[in-house]
A protein has these predicted regions:
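N-terminal, positively charged/glycine-rich alpha-helical extensions of SAM-dependent methyltransferases
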Residues: 2-34
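Class I SAM-dependent methyltransferase Rossmann-like catalytic core
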Residues: 32-46
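Conserved alpha-helix/loop element of class I SAM-dependent methyltransferases that forms part
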Residues: 45-64
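A short acidic, Gly/Pro-enriched loop at the edge of an enzyme's catalytic core
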Residues: 116-128
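A short glycine-rich, Lys/Arg-flanked "PGG" loop and its adjoining helix->strand segment in the class I
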Residues: 141-153
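Conserved beta-strand signature within the Rossmann-like core of class I S-adenosyl-L-methionine
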Residues: 154-162
């Protein structure tokens, strides 16, 4: 299977995929025959466990409504459920990945391009999780503005950003800008191992939204 040889690091052709449709097709192919989940397992992908564990320490309650942005095959949803959370919606660009999510795990699933405005009212969610989506050729920093918009006052935004694109794509500037404007405040920000066996590092950020 050609996907098995693909790496998520700089060697991947994925960082050359500029068009949204190309990224979608890449993941649609990867979703075939459960290859995505198998690769994540093989690569010891610790993103969901590590991120949800960090998030759980600061979450107001287990009943808050969570938006899982770029939910893929539902790995974050499975971890949220395992840690006692019970209300989450998922969104992803790839319909095939969405189709592979176990029934009933998420209350709502939607095919969404996170580089576009999210079709959602302001102040709906108690938290936004975005794990493994800020990487090569994917979702750009303005998505963070949308995450803030759809999150309630004092809600949490928890995300990982591939370290190779953190500065290159301008995530550092966007994060600082939101802090400077008083739209969120930092709860935690640290380096995560992410994919243990592939030597791909990521920044893990946890921010509290401030609505004046």
């Amino acid at each position: 299977h050609p996907m098995a040889q693909k790496d998520i690091g700089h060697k991947v052709p994925i960082h050359t995929l500029s068009k949204t449709a190309d990224v979608r097709d890449f993941y649609d192919d990867w979703a075939d025959k459960d290859q995505y989940n198998q690769d994540m397992h093989d690569w010891n992908y610790t993103g969901p466990l590590e991120t949800v564990t960090a998030f759980e320490k600061h979450a107001a309650s287990k009943d808050i409504l969570i938006f899982d942005a770029g939910c893929g095959t539902g790995l974050v949803g499975k971890e949220l459920k395992r840690q006692g959370f019970n209300a989450f919606h998922g969104a992803d660009l790839s319909q095939k990945l969405l189709d592979s999510i176990p029934n009933g795990l998420y209350q709502q699933l939607e095919k969404v391009d996170l580089n576009m405005p999210i079709k959602c009212d302001d102040n709906v969610y108690g938290a936004v999780m975005c794990v493994g989506t800020f990487t090569f050729g994917h979702v750009k920093p303005p998505a963070l503005d949308e995450f803030v918009r759809i999150t309630k006052d004092e809600g949490l935004i928890c995300f990982t950003i591939n370290e190779a694109i953190y500065k290159e794509y301008g995530f550092d500037k966007k994060i600082a800008e939101l802090e400077m404007k008083g739209q969120w405040t930092r709860v935690a920000f640290f380096k995560s191992d992410y994919i243990a066996s592939k030597d791909v590092g990521a920044w893990l950020g946890l921010y509290k939204v401030i609505k004046v």
